[in-house]
Amino acid sequence: MFLGPSGIGKTTQAELWNRYRDALIINGDVVFVQETEETFLGWGTPWHGSSPYCENTNVPVEALIVLKQAPENSIRELTGFEKVTAVSESVFYPRWLEGGMELCLETLDHLLSALPVYELSCRPDEGAVELVERTVFGRAL
């Protein structure tokens, strides 16, 4: 799942995965994460920002990828507080919903404990896709 502020390239990276690896794009802006007994699922939402993607389906979340634009592709795993800070900036906190903050923070804690978080400094090219697939999946898909 790609994370970052508006305009950083979340939809661009998703479109590269769609083009080169036939990946399904469920949303270009806001994804809900559900914790199940086996895994975490990313769900498409009707809030899609400027992208046209808003599928009512889910996909397993294998890793969190925090995007940065760069002249060359590189990736590194984040740890500790750096991981928390990088991901927290992309979380939608439901302050108005009774029990929503607690559920959100509990899910975030479980998510950050269970999944790797990477910072991907990248260009909008197939090389970024290859780098992520080697790092996250341990092989070329």
Question: Model regions: which residues?
Answer:
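Glycine-rich, often acidic-flanked micro-motifs
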Residues: 1-3, 18-141
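Conserved lysine of the Walker
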Residues: 10
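Post-Walker A alpha-helix
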Residues: 13-14
